[in-house]
């Protein structure tokens, strides 16, 4: 009888614990949503330093929040804090190695620090995950262009446009690369 009573008490405690945990989770989720909204407001107002502070608060509550890590990295990149942004993207990739947003943004940060081959490696990794990722193709084209591989770069831009005909980055970059190629070799036909 005592054993049965003990089992019932454990079940009640477990059920209460479950209810309390759910309520705490709801409160935390609401708090995280509020912090994300405040960070987004800061971004809209171009108050990037304060946005980073909100991302830090989110990460204090939830250190494995991939969205906060990526958003913080992008914001740090805007602020010109490239090494810190790469560190933030790396943390996101440790948690989610196949996160395409983290890979593309890390590649973009590497591109800004003129590490074009490393940037291309990030874009290639993103393309292994999703062959139809037009942004990875467009950014890869930019890095190839910086390395002087205009023909390959144009090919990437065209592939990006075949996937997303509204990819402005790919369209503008393709036109620019074609003009550059034409100025280098006036006899070349349009690629």
Locate predicted features:
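Alpha-helical segment of the N-proximal tetratricopeptide repeat
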Residues: 28-61, 67, 74-78
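Helix-start (N-cap) detector for alpha-helical repeat units in TPR-like alpha-solenoids
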Residues: 32, 66-67, 100-101, 134-135, ...
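Position-specific recognition of the canonical hydrophobic site in helix A of tetratricopeptide repeat
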Residues: 43, 70, 77, 104, ...
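Conserved structural position within tetratricopeptide repeats
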Residues: 57-60, 90-94, 124-128, 161-162
């Amino acid at each position: 009888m005592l054993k049965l009573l003990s089992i019932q008490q454990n079940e009640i405690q477990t059920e209460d614990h479950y209810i309390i945990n759910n309520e705490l989770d709801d409160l935390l989720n609401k708090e995280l949503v509020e912090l994300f909204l405040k960070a987004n407001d800061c971004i809209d107002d171009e108050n990037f330093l304060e946005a980073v502070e909100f991302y830090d608060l989110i990460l204090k509550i939830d250190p494995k929040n991939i969205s906060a890590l990526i958003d913080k990295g992008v914001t740090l990149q805007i602020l010109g804090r490239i090494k810190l942004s790469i560190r933030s993207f790396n943390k996101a990739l440790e948690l989610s190695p196949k996160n395409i947003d983290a890979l593309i943004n890390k590649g973009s940060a590497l591109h800004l620090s003129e590490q074009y081959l490393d940037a291309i490696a990030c874009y290639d990794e993103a393309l292994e995950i999703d062959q139809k990722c037009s942004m990875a193709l467009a950014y890869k084209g930019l890095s190839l262009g910086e390395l002087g591989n205009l023909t390959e770069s144009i090919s990437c831009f065209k592939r990006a446009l075949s996937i997303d005909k509204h990819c402005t980055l790919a369209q503008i970059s393709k036109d620019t690369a074609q003009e550059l190629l034409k100025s280098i070799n006036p006899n070349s036909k349009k690629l």
